[in-house]
């Protein structure tokens, strides 16, 4: 559902959320909004059906998936320093956070 919403945005300029697509499928949107979405979904479905016959286009469709953010990793030493600091001062001010960040770089 999220991929459908993203594909609609890529092709037609309107990104629709996973929730919207889900509610469309469950007929839980207003009649007016359903009438707005139906032509876009029909057009997308026809284009998708016609392009999936070619193996080259399958790669393009797969490449349209959402890009995920990389997982943040913190070095062991930095993690220890942060944990020690927050044990001493659980609610640091913005200035203290900035100073701590500068000292850890």
From Swiss-Prot:
Protein's UniProt keywords contain Oxidoreductase: no
Protein species of origin: Xenopus laevis (African clawed frog)
Subcellular location: Nucleus
GO BP, one annotated term: regulation of transcription by RNA polymerase II
GO molecular function, one term: RNA polymerase II cis-regulatory region sequence-specific DNA binding
Keywords per UniProt: Activator, DNA-binding, Homeobox, Nucleus, Transcription, Transcription regulation
Name of the protein: Homeotic protein NRL-19
Annotated POU-specific domain residues: 1-49
Presence of keyword Transcription regulation: yes
Record-annotated DNA-binding residue ranges: 67-105
GO CC list: nucleus
Chief site of localization: nucleus
Protein family: Belongs to the POU transcription factor family. Class-3 subfamily.
